Structures are given as structure tokens and as C-alpha cells.
Swiss-Prot record:
Component of the shieldin complex, consisting of SHLD1, SHLD2, SHLD3 and MAD2L2/REV7. Within the complex, SHLD2 forms a scaffold which interacts with a SHLD3-MAD2L2 subcomplex via its N-terminus, and with SHLD1 via its C-terminus. Interacts with ASTE1. This is Shieldin complex subunit 1. Residues 32-55 have a biased composition (Low complexity). Pfam families: SHLD1_C.
Length: 206
């Protein structure tokens, strides 16, 4: 019986001795797990807090880049031939328009002492039409045509209109009412302006 009783105790001691490496292995495994978890946590913390960019760490460089970009944009505007050419073209057109307006205003009145009431009436009719066309960009060509006609009639009189008037009494019957298209055009005088004036009351009463 004693031999049998000693046997289980010896077996339990042996089992404890045999189980000890397993316990050691388990503790070492847990230690390695803790190390790996610590390293993974440190990596995740690094990922969640990315490194600061150069623009954040150096505000002076950011402002410098903004100033350089602004200066480059302004330089590109002046160095761009299309932008500069367009600006110069607009200025030239404005200057030319103002010069033409001054020219037409200075020579759009009958010469003093001409004594031609028809020329005065025609110029007054043209002045009214010009006032209606001023400020309309779509009628810029018509405006210049009427202004040039006013200058020509103020200088040369209205003999051109009288030749085409149906009620004129200044020319033989075979020449009355001659077509505007059949006559050689007067430089600077539009046929459309002549047709317009022939339809006005001032010419029908002449």
C-alpha cells in the first residue's frame, strides 16, 4: 500500500516538474505578446500623428511663396504679349474715337456766310439723327456715316441731294430723279445716308 501511495505523489511531482517548462513557455509567450503589442501601439500612434509638413513648421516660407506667386502673376500680365497688346489696342481705339468726335464736332456746321437754308436744314436733320445714334455700339458705323455726311454737306452744300430729289427744279427734266446708284459716289458720303435724306420732309419741301 505504501508503495502504491507513494506512486501517485511521485507522479504528481513529476507532472509538476514536467509542467514547469510549459508554464515558463507561457510566461515568455505572454511577455513577447506584450512587447509586440507595445510596438504595434507605438506604430499606430505614429500613424495617427503624422509628421508636420514643411509649410506648417516654417510659416515664413509659406508667406514667401505667396509673395513670389503674386509677383510672378503681375510680371506674367505685363510680359504676356496678348494682354499688353489688348490693353494698348483699347487705349488706341478710345483715343481715335475721341479724336473723330472732336473732328466731326468742329466741322459739322455750315460755313459762315454760306446763305444756304437747305444746307442748314439738312445739317439740323443730321444732327438730330446723330443724337439718336450716339451711345449705341451696334450703330457705330451708321453714326460715323451720318457724321461724315454732315461734314461734307456743311462744306459743299446740298447740290448732291438736289440732283437726286424728284421735286427739284434746278436740272432739266431728263435728269430729274436720277438714281443714286447711277452716279459716281462722293468720297466719304454713304448712299444710304443720301436715300435717308431724300425721304425726309426737309428735302420734299425744297
Amino acid at each position: 500500500m505504501e508503495s502504491q501511495a507513494a506512486t501517485p505523489s511521485s507522479l504528481s511531482g513529476e507532472s509538476c516538474t514536467l509542467d514547469l517548462p510549459a508554464v515558463c513557455d507561457t510566461s515568455s509567450y505572454e511577455a513577447s505578446q506584450r512587447v509586440s503589442q507595445g510596438s504595434s501601439n507605438s506604430l499606430s500612434s505614429l500613424e495617427s500623428h503624422p509628421f508636420l509638413s514643411s509649410s506648417t513648421t516654417d510659416p515664413d516660407s509659406n508667406s514667401l511663396n505667396t509673395e513670389q506667386k503674386g509677383s510672378w502673376d503681375s510680371e506674367n500680365f505685363w510680359l504676356d504679349p496678348s494682354s499688353k497688346g489688348q490693353l494698348e489696342t483699347n487705349e488706341e481705339e478710345d483715343g481715335l474715337r475721341k479724336s473723330l468726335d472732336r473732328f466731326y464736332e468742329a466741322f459739322a456746321h455750315p460755313l459762315p456766310g454760306s446763305g444756304d437754308p437747305l444746307s442748314a436744314s439738312v445739317c439740323q436733320c443730321l444732327s438730330q439723327t446723330i443724337s439718336e445714334l450716339e451711345g449705341q455700339e451696334s450703330q457705330r458705323y451708321a453714326l460715323r456715316s451720318f457724321q461724315m455726311a454732315q461734314v461734307i454737306f456743311s462744306r459743299d452744300g446740298c447740290s448732291i441731294l438736289q440732283r437726286h430729289s424728284r421735286d427739284t427744279r434746278f436740272y432739266p427734266l431728263e435728269q430729274e430723279g436720277s438714281s443714286v446708284d447711277d452716279e459716281e459716289p462722293t468720297p466719304g458720303l454713304s448712299r444710304e445716308v443720301i436715300r435717308f435724306l431724300l425721304e425726309q420732309t426737309v428735302m420734299k419741301d425744297s
